[in-house]
């Protein structure tokens, strides 16, 4: 890796689900939390099904990614329940997702980028409010290490009306080509040199984003993603939850290095 003489022109783009945090996805966790709090009106399930039928010709992936009708009419701050007027099962009734833990090795990689002066950007198909919560949590975790950094977010935006979600999204769901377009647009606005930028993702929906930068890496990749990464000569990492680190540390870690770049976790190239 060449020494960075203009670190302000470099960004590190991170997917969230499966890359920085373990699955299930953030949206699935949020949906489960809403259901547990009885925050979803029964009619929203039928609205979701109707929307799914309408999107069916676009394929299963689009049917799931662009269909947020289960959120229709819900207040954006998550207050209120729809359980027959009974108090919510949790004190305040706020339907907010508990922030999951970041992979320790992923957090180390983010910290390294922040220390180099690289911009940190979360590029995720999850709902924008959830990605913003994760960005805030990431800023806090970095601050605990004495690192001051901001974290930008590119995620699936939700339409609002009168302080409530309509169930429709604004623009495209942040998957596939939409990720690459978001990265390119941000690069134009911020003056990033994409040939010097980094991107981390776990699935083929991240492929376009990884292809858009000069330093792509597959993290905890699906089998198809790993085959692609090997063909392209991309770095491949395995980042684990904290409970798995003791076991993994007993095996010699293979590390692929480019100059002074730390590649964390069980890393390999091609």
Residue ranges, per PLM feature:
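C-terminal cap/substrate-recognition subdomain and adjoining C-terminal extension
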Residues: 2-3, 7-11, 93, 97-270
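Active-site neighborhood of HAD-like aspartate-dependent phosphohydrolases
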Residues: 2-61
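Active-site phosphate-binding/coordination module
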Residues: 23, 79, 156
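A generic alpha-helix surface/boundary motif
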Residues: 24-28, 64-65, 129, 177, ...
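Short, surface-exposed acidic
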Residues: 39-46, 76-81, 143-150, 194
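A general structural signal for well-ordered secondary-structure junctions
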Residues: 39-43, 85, 216, 235
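Short, compositionally biased "basic patch" segments
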Residues: 49-76, 152-159
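Metal-dependent phosphoesterase signature
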Residues: 62-108, 116
